[in-house]
Design a protein with these regions (language model features):
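N-terminal targeting leaders of membrane proteins
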Residues: 1-87, 108, 179-181
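A subset of solvent-exposed loop/turn segments in beta-rich extracellular surface proteins, enriched
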Residues: 20, 27, 89-119, 155-158
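Transmembrane beta-barrel outer-membrane domains
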Residues: 41, 48-50, 121-125, 168-170
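Short hydrophobic alpha-helical membrane-entry/anchor segments
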Residues: 58-66, 80-94, 133-154
Length: 181
């Protein structure tokens, strides 16, 4: 991580120096370096998390619009294909043409669903599980790609950060409140 590298660099340079011997300007510079390193780490983590949840979003964040669009389209295709396939593998009397879900009493809908065995639902459930697995693999690939993109953009100077000396805890609202992404 960027923060660990910055800390290692600091400790290798100032092993013999006492903390009290540092001037306020030097402390401010160190705090700025740490804040930039922390922002870099958070940017990479956020890119990866966004791409894992919605493949392509981390790529968009890193201005790789072609890969982002391709991964987002692949994700939408996997989700749509999985849902459509699972629907058509349901027993025929549960489909929308046979059962009006908006105007039929709940007890009748429940009775119809309970009239089938587990084996009747197995093909649909297997397709849902397979689609979920494919979506997870796609999210993992996209997350890894977005993390590499973020690191490359940081190293090439395409993404820059300014020192922020007000280092708040994760989430930033103090008193234990906050948000994470």
């Amino acid at each position: 991580t960027y923060l660990r590298a910055e800390l290692d660099s600091l400790f290798s340079m100032t092993q013999e120096e006492e903390l009290g011997a540092l001037s306020l300007g030097e402390l401010r510079e160190l705090a700025g370096r740490f804040s930039v390193a922390r922002q870099k780490d958070r940017f990479v983590a956020r890119s990866k998390a966004m791409s894992f949840m919605a493949p392509g979003m981390g790529e968009f964040m890193n201005k790789d619009y072609g890969s982002g669009a391709a991964l987002l389209a692949a994700d939408l295709a996997v989700v749509a294909g999985t849902l459509a396939g699972a629907y058509f593998l349901l027993p025929e009397d549960l489909r929308f043409q046979q059962l009006d879900y908006l105007n039929t009493p709940w007890a009748a809908i429940r009775g119809r669903w309970e009239s089938h065995t587990f084996m009747d639902y197995l093909p649909s459930m297997a397709l849902l599980a397979g689609g979920g697995l494919v979506k997870g693999i796609l999210g993992r690939l996209s997350s890894t790609h977005a993390g590499k993109l973020a690191r490359r953009n940081i190293e090439q100077g395409k993404i820059t950060f300014e020192p922020d000396l007000l280092l708040l805890p994760d989430g930033g609202m103090m008193m234990g409140m906050g948000w994470r992404y």
